[in-house]
Regions:
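Conserved beta-strand signature within the Rossmann-like core of class I S-adenosyl-L-methionine
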Residues: 74-85, 279-285
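Conserved SAM-binding motif I beta-strand of class I
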Residues: 7-13
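A conserved beta-strand element that flanks and buttresses the S-adenosyl-L-methionine
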Residues: 49-52
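Flexible, glycine-/basic-rich loop-and-beta segments that form/coincide
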Residues: 132-174
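Short, glycine-/aromatic-enriched active-site segment of Class I SAM-dependent methyltransferases
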Residues: 80-105, 109-111
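A short glycine-rich, Lys/Arg-flanked "PGG" loop and its adjoining helix->strand segment in the class I
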Residues: 64-81, 272
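Conserved SAM-binding strand-loop segment of SAM-dependent methyltransferases
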Residues: 25-40, 241-243
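Conserved SAM-binding loop of SAM-dependent methyltransferases across substrates and taxa
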Residues: 1-6
Length: 291
């Protein structure tokens, strides 16, 4: 919606969020993007100057046909901008909690380059961003259309240094020690008869809870913001209930474990505003207690 009013925009998504976009006045096709939809778009709207795909690639099975359709929909001098959860911060900050069935793959600049090159698209700029605990934004076009930024070369160099067999072996060790340290931290708290609520029920919470073997005797419940469709359900694989965070007004735990730890500063600020006076457990990149 940021471009609306300045440019002609069009969204494509198979999800319910598309209906919200339509209500907000953003033209949206509620369907999966593919060759058929691409042809439909070209016929009705013409080709696009800019195409964006935000956190999309990791969820798509037939990725090559998608890239083919993206290229088909792009103008000759068009730019394709994609954002993907980035492999480099994932292993550096021990984000094992984000490895789950919904994510089919994790991207580096090297792998994105390999994919786009196959379809004669060239990466001419790159940027690391903070989304999802660390993502990579790449700008691509048909070969030779734009000058290649020095940032691309620098990023390849950085990956060569930090993404290798050694780094993955280190990641494996860090995952195991992180699990043990977090479990011991929680055990010490429970040994003192303190109670713990969780905050946020993203998929990563389910991965972490099940990997550690936590249950409702350890985590009383997980809180979600009022209106979340997850309220009234349970964390998969457990009997830990997901409740409305408004229960904090009459039931205050000693500790809150922040499952969306990558936005901990924002969460802590909001929870303190709502009157929480206890302590926070930050599970990753290294387990610790914060006030």
């Amino acid at each position: 919606g940021n471009f609306k009013g300045k440019h002609r925009v069009l969204g494509v998504t198979p999800e319910k969020i598309g209906k919200i976009a339509i209500k907000k006045g953003i033209p949206t096709i509620i369907d999966y993007f593919n060759k058929r939809i691409s042809s439909k778009i070209i016929k009705k709207y013409g080709k696009a100057k800019i195409i964006t795909a935000t956190n999309v690639f990791a969820h798509i099975d037939d990725i090559n046909n998608i890239v083919k359709s993206i290229k088909q929909t792009l103008k000759e001098d068009g730019v394709f901008i994609s954002e993907s959860h980035y492999l480099l911060p994932l292993i550096q900050t021990v984000q094992y909690d984000t490895i789950y069935h919904e994510h089919l793959r994790y991207y580096s600049l090297e792998s994105l380059n390999f994919l786009l090159k196959k379809h004669k698209l060239e990466i001419f700029d790159v940027k690391e961003i903070s989304t999802h605990g660390g993502s990579i934004r790449v700008y691509a076009s048909r070969k030779g259309k734009y000058k290649i930024s020095q940032r691309v070369k620098k990023q390849f160099k950085k990956e060569k240094k930090h993404l290798n067999k050694k780094s993955f072996e280190k990641f494996k060790k860090n995952v195991i020690s992180s699990k043990i340290n977090l479990f011991n931290l929680i055990k010490k708290i429970k040994d003192k008869n303190k109670n713990i609520f969780g905050v946020g029920a993203p998929s990563r919470a389910s991965t972490l809870i099940n990997y550690l073997g936590l249950d409702q005797d350890i985590i009383d419940c997980v809180l979600e913001i009022n209106g979340s469709y997850k309220i009234g359900n349970y964390i998969p694989g457990t009997k830990i209930p997901i409740l409305d965070e408004r229960i904090l007004s009459n039931k205050m735990p000693d500790f809150l474990i922040l499952f969306s730890w990558h936005i901990k500063d924002e969460l802590k600020k909001n929870l303190k505003k709502k009157g929480f006076k206890g302590k926070f457990i930050i599970p990753l990149p290294y387990p610790r207690i914060e006030t």
